[in-house]
Regions:
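Short glycine/proline- and acidic residue-enriched helix-loop micro-motifs
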Residues: 185-199
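Catalytic core of the metallo-beta-lactamase
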Residues: 2-63, 119-183, 204-217
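Active-site metal-binding motif and surrounding structural segment of the metallo-beta-lactamase
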Residues: 57, 63-106
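Short loop/helix-cap segments at secondary-structure boundaries that form the rim of catalytic
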Residues: 95-96, 111-118, 129
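Short, polar loop motifs at secondary-structure junctions
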Residues: 87, 106-113, 122-126
Length: 244
């Protein structure tokens, strides 16, 4: 595909680049890449989903070096940029500049904050039902973020989560100590900092995650921080619910 690079600022993309992993396939139409940011304490994942129309949905974008961007563009045309929470604004302006026709989508409750960085064209709550994609609003949290449900073949689905479940290993240094002391690292869980920001009500959220654990069609759960849930997903979700 042709990328429209504004001549006024040909280096705009280079300024967005920080270390990242290669694109990794999770399923035939689902990929993840992990990027790091100097101002962020935890790496962040971008999840890429390809629809039946060969259009790409980019969830929590991460700017990639040109070889990886060409690899991404070879998968399909970037058509939807999901900003899953107002705090995930890094790189969004650069992606809109690179792909002027991309749809900019975020949760309704995050629009005011995201709009400080880029114009939001659609809310998740309106956009995805119109396009045949399920968008969950988990009970017991502020609606600043939600969960996307996408098909991955053979009657199975993937859940694209944001910060709701974090799965980071123990980290070094003082911040790593804080994570360990607050039981926020080492295994998949709803961590302390997320519980505070989303004002989690434990009982309804626990019931929601426990209900997900009962489903047998959930093959993958992606996260914005740490490793995605790829094996023993039902039991892992059950443990997350019990731990909450």
């Amino acid at each position: 595909m042709t990328v429209e690079t504004p001549m006024k600022d040909p280096c705009y993309w280079d300024r967005e680049l920080f270390p990242h992993t290669p694109l990794r396939a999770l399923a035939p139409d689902l990929w993840v890449v992990q990027g790091s940011f100097p101002a962020a304490r935890l790496p962040r994942n971008m999840v890429v989903y390809r629809s039946a129309q060969q259009a790409l949905l980019l969830h929590s974008v991460v700017a990639l070096a040109e070889p990886e961007m060409r690899e991404l563009e070879a998968l399909g045309e970037p058509a939807v940029m999901v900003i899953p929470h107002w705090d995930h604004w890094a790189h969004i302006a650069a992606f809109k500049k690179r792909y002027p026709r991309i749809d900019v989508v975020c949760p309704r409750a995050s629009i005011d904050q995201v709009s400080k960085h880029i114009e939001v064209e659609y809310s998740c709550e309106d956009y995805f039902p119109r396009h045949g994609v399920k968008y969950h609003q988990p009970p017991g949290i502020r609606p600043l973020e939600g969960v996307l449900e996408v098909p991955v073949g053979a009657g199975k689905v993937a859940l694209l989560m944001n910060d709701l479940i974090t799965n980071v290993p123990h980290q070094p240094g003082f911040y790593g100590l804080v994570l360990r002391l607050t039981r926020s690292s080492g295994k998949p869980r709803v961590i302390y900092f997320v519980r505070r920001q989303l004002r989690v009500q434990r009982q309804p959220l626990r019931a929601y995650i426990a209900a997900l654990a009962q489903r047998r069609d959930i093959e993958i759960v992606t996260t914005s921080h740490g490793e995605c849930l790829l094996t023993d997903v039902a039991n892992t979700l059950s443990r997350v619910a019990q731990d909450l």
